[in-house]
Amino acid sequence: MSKKLAKKRQPVKPVVAKEPARTAKNFGYEEMLSELEAIVADAETRLAEDEATA
């Protein structure tokens, strides 16, 4: 790469994604467990639907 091209490039500013405050800190063990069970139940339902349509 020539020096001319290197000089013309603008420095790329890193994009900083602002993450919302994590609410997981406020969850207790039982709440986390129930959320995980709900996620697994949804996944099992989706898998069953996918198998039925395939």
Curated annotation (Swiss-Prot):
The protein's name in its UniProt record: Uncharacterized protein YhaL
Organism annotation: Escherichia coli (strain K12)
